[in-house]
Amino acid sequence: MLLFLLITLLSAIFIFAKRHYTQWQRLGLVSDEAVIPFGSLAKVFRKERPFGLVMYDLYEKFQEQVVGIYLFFKPALLIRDAELARQILTSDFNSFHDRGIYVDEKNDPMSANLFALEGQSWRTLRMKLTPSFSSGKLKGMFETVDDVGNKLLEYLNNQLKDGQTHVLDIKSILTTYAIDIIGSVIFGLEIDSFTNPDNEFRVLSDRSFDNESRSFLSKLQNLTNFVCPPIAKLLTRLGTKEPVVYRLRDIVKRTIEFREENNVVRKDLLHLLIQLRNTGKISDDNDNLWNKVESTATNLKAMSIDMIASNSFLFYIAGSETTASSTSFTIYELAMNPEALKKAQNEVDECLKKHGIKPDGRITYEAIQDMKYLDLCVKETTRKYPGLPFLNRQCTQDFKVPNSKFTIKKDTNVIISLLGLHRDAKYFPEPLAYKPERFADETKDYDAAAYMPFGEGPRHCIAQRMGVMNTKVALAKILANFNIEPMPHKEAEFQFNTAPVLVPVNGLRVGLSKRSFNRR
């Protein structure tokens, strides 16, 4: 009798699961065949492919405009059409204004950042933070970025002091560069990870990106933040927390309190956030922007330390990996494309000469803005290797797909594979070729609707211009002072990681040597 009940129960579960995982077929939608209980993510669970590449594989597998997929238990939709994707992100933003990822403002304030927040909470914070990344603010912070760029230059000079060509893991080196910029500009710390790689901030950074050192629960939470928020919320309620996040919170708290008590002013993003905390707004671009900010009573603060810390951590995660990746992938591609390398290097030389800057001297904000071909290179890199290989949204009100009978129902998650769109020959001829000129006005050769490396619409990356600036500074320093040795073409491969970014297998190794005028 017991055996009969067990068989009946298992059969009922199987029938229910089968029905659940055929939801899209029953609605007449082309869909991926689900693997119970992983849905479309069996390869993610088996650590064979990261989430972004699984979405890319599904993009390549089908031809339809909208494809049904399953994020573990949750039915979702993969958008394969550039115009529809852009419509979701822009003109019909009101139907897709949330990301549908884990956030718990009340019980987990460190989750309440600009990326995850929903509805009015997101709108209010976005409006407050937007002035932080204006041209005037970036110009004010530029000197700090250039300082880190000079430390990068000094480190490379030491590595190449014998005058020979050395093959270096440029991804690892530029990760150090990016982390030091974040530590300095976002967290207000005076650090130099090139000479002191064991400093606390660098150690914490390494831990946050080291997939192997994470516990199983930490990896699970990192994945479920995106694909199954209720499980992420449950794990948090059960006490699963990321130690690195809370240690960085302590660093932010300590720095803010020290600055408020001692009226310390530094031209960085943290100063602007302290200004927002004490006055309720960030000043316009003017001469008084970087003046000291009088502290207000704790109960009158417009922004809590937790909110500053959570958004600082967001800028750190988003900024460090994307800057390191875009810069290192650009160098990697230039090494395989000598014509583009020559154009980029010649432009840097000419711009520095025009602005009266020595190759190893201080670069100015204006000189970086003049490097237009370098802009094309960065655009092409972020096309081929988008910092975030997918975008996700949640339908917040029923939405009828144009020229279709299909309606996306409220609460349905949608995924846009940026890697898929950006490598689709329909939108970008010869998608695996590195062709910066495709973005030049006079030789434009792409469908603009499909290009969205920083997202589009009201929720596009708020720090986009800062990321491009940081990338161009590093590229200009390297191109002005070093030869990038040509190498045979080899497409980068990506390893499994629970973080939603593209992580190259074994880094990116490129040969560098000092340019003749730079020999010591």
From Swiss-Prot:
It comes from Musca domestica (House fly). One of its GO terms (molecular function) is iron ion binding. Heme binds at residue 461. Induction: By phenobarbital in susceptible CS (16-fold) and in the LPR (1.6-fold) strains. Its main location: endoplasmic reticulum. Gene3D superfamilies: Cytochrome P450. The lineage of its organism: Eukaryota, Metazoa, Ecdysozoa, Arthropoda, Hexapoda. Belongs to the cytochrome P450 family. Changing residue 221 to R: In allele CYP6D3v1, allele CYP6D3v3 and allele CYP6D3v4. It comes from the Eukaryota. This is Cytochrome P450 6d3. Keywords: Endoplasmic reticulum, Heme, Iron, Membrane, Metal-binding, Microsome, Monooxygenase, Oxidoreductase. Metabolizes pyrethroid insecticides and other xenobiotics.
